[in-house]
Amino acid sequence: MTGKEDNDACVLHDKSLKLVLKSRSIVIAGEITKDVSRLFQEKILLLEALDFKKPIFVYIDSEGGDIDAGFAIFNMIRFVKPKVFTVGVGLVASAAALIFLAAKLENRFSLPFARYLLHQPLSGFKGVATDIEIYTNELNKVKKELNNIISKETGQKISKIEKDTDRDFWLDSSAAKKYGLVFEVVETKYQLEEFISA
């Protein structure tokens, strides 16, 4: 990067941070990585420190990604004092669906054309047989944890969750509401604010 590019990046970061602080909103878009998780944790802790009585909004449009990074974001949403609202705005898939479920049911909203994907954790692991066996056992534990969270947060029986997540399970916003993923589908910020203030 040139000096000008560095400066432009800093200015953009400053503007982005000011917008986060003013709106108390965090956007999770694209692949969920360790870096995305770290930045999210920094922002949510900063918002908590500034005013723990005001809510925080998390807008999600993500194909998923690193499940451990997803769990870290999930944990932080539940850890902080402010009430956190999650809003599905586009694709909410895999680890992103886990993050979406970190908010209480009454704090989970969807825009009309958001889509949701639940499935078992994916593995691209390669190695010797014993390492593969160890990794498979760990992956099965993660799968069980995910299914338990989905069951608890949606009210669906664990047997149904296990069946549904065995393969890719797609839901549009209205189906996600019926399933218990989403509390309400809203079209505008005004509608969201009405539900929050009710």
From Swiss-Prot:
Compartments, record wording: Cytoplasm
SUPFAM superfamilies: ClpP/crotonase (SSF52096)
Main location as per UniProt: cytoplasm
Catalysed reaction, written as an equation: Hydrolysis of proteins to small peptides in the presence of ATP and magnesium. alpha-casein is the usual test substrate. In the absence of ATP, only oligopeptides shorter than five residues are hydrolyzed (such as succinyl-Leu-Tyr-|-NHMec, and Leu-Tyr-Leu-|-Tyr-Trp, in which cleavage of the -Tyr-|-Leu- and -Tyr-|-Trp bonds also occurs)
EC class of the enzyme, as a word: hydrolase
GO molecular function: ATP-dependent peptidase activity; ATPase binding; serine-type endopeptidase activity
EC number: 3.4.21.92
Pfam families, sorted: CLP_protease (PF00574)
UniProt entry keywords in alphabetical sequence: Cytoplasm, Hydrolase, Protease, Serine protease
InterPro entries in UniProt: ClpP (IPR001907), ClpP/crotonase-like_dom_sf (IPR029045), ClpP/TepA (IPR023562), ClpP_His_AS (IPR033135)
Gene Ontology cellular component annotations, sorted alphabetically: cytoplasm; endopeptidase Clp complex
PROSITE patterns (UniProt xref): CLP_PROTEASE_HIS
Keyword match Cytoplasm: yes
GO biological process, one term: protein quality control for misfolded or incompletely synthesized proteins
Active site residues of this protein: 94 (nucleophile), 119
Known role: Cleaves peptides in various proteins in a process that requires ATP hydrolysis. Has a chymotrypsin-like activity. Plays a major role in the degradation of misfolded proteins.
PANTHER family, per the entry: ATP-DEPENDENT CLP PROTEASE PROTEOLYTIC SUBUNIT
Matching HAMAP family: ClpP (MF_00444)
Subunit structure: Fourteen ClpP subunits assemble into 2 heptameric rings which stack back to back to give a disk-like structure with a central cavity, resembling the structure of eukaryotic proteasomes.
Family: Belongs to the peptidase S14 family.
Name of this protein: ATP-dependent Clp protease proteolytic subunit 2
Gene: clpP2
